[in-house]
From Swiss-Prot:
It is found in: Membrane. One of its GO terms (cellular component) is membrane. It comes from Borreliella burgdorferi (strain ATCC 35210 / DSM 4680 / CIP 102532 / B31) (Borrelia burgdorferi). This is Uncharacterized protein BB_0019. The chain crosses the membrane at residues 96-116. It is a single-pass membrane protein. It comes from the Bacteria. Keywords: Membrane, Transmembrane, Transmembrane helix.
Amino acid sequence: MFIVSLLLLFSVLNVYSNSLDYFKSNFNYLKLSDAKSLPLQDKSTSSGNFVSHKKNNNMSVADNDDSFLYKNIQENKALNLENDLESKSAKDFFRFSAISIGSFPIVLFLSLFFFDVSYYFYSGMNANYVPYPFSNGPSFSKDEIYKKFIVSASIGAIVALTIALLDYFL
């Protein structure tokens, strides 16, 4: 606990010791005309560890819809990789891979949780095998942990690919 407190203290001191010019927002790489109208762009100055912001009160809150920075992000070719793909099969493969890779961590977490719950009920609700979020975790041997992870990862990969296939065919 003491080591964790020291790490937290040093990380906070490190953040406050760095100059805040490093964290200044820069929207030049987006090449969007609306980035210039952001209130803090090129208006923050720093001196040591102190930052001052000049207020820009002439920016209206209710602008027209085209001024929203991320409204047309899907149509912007610089930001959207899918627009660079020209064949339909390449776009379908890109979508399939994005959905399967994106859903895998969620499905892996759920399969690990349900594996723990099933092991708890299979062992006769033994207090040593209460699932992880409700206790310190079951006391498995290294071989059982390896088997649990392999089974859960296999189930997670199969379910993630099934979700991507369902999206492709539907």
